Amino acid sequence: MSPAQSAEYYEQNGRWAAVLNFRDGVQASSDERSRGGLVTEFLTGTLSPMDFARQIDLQDYAGFNLIIGDAAQAVIVNNRGHAPTPLYSGLYVISNGQPEDSWFKTEWLRGRLRQEVLPLIAEDSSPAYWQAAAFNILSDSTKAPEDKLPMTGVAFEVEQMLSSVYIEPVAFGDTKTSKPTYGTRTQSILTLRKERDMGANYTADIVSREFDSH
């Protein structure tokens, strides 16, 4: 499902969703269901975020973190021991481990958001005022020092490659070519805003940048 389609679903019914793979060194099996299907099922369904999270057959999927929400509630769940949990107002930075994990990239991103983006939003919440700063942060390729790398069951070189907010294009895996096969492909900012003159109505805006070098 494209970012534009996701924004359209929010405009229609106030629903949004994102899924991340859970990195623990366990290879996905061919008979497991697509994790991306969880996003489509929620966006096109009618269950509340919490009810949807509770009815997922967790064992049917490879490891994932799923964040789903509507205008009233947001919930995170994974199939690595994290039960469906409401997300209340605040700043959340989630990567490919447990939601509460403090990886270098999540704390680096959190710090830059607090210092460079949140002050801009406080001045003027219109997306055009602060989105450029946010995209600049999402493009940060600073890698973690060796002593701050998480241990997720992959090789050291891979762990370091994955440790930055923006993952630079690289030839990854068993490949005969030097052409990049892995890296950050899309950066998206979804903004949900309550309109003062429209009662309880919200508007959704999504802006994405695509990278086609791999």
Language model features by range: what are they?
Residues 1-214:
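N-terminal nucleophile
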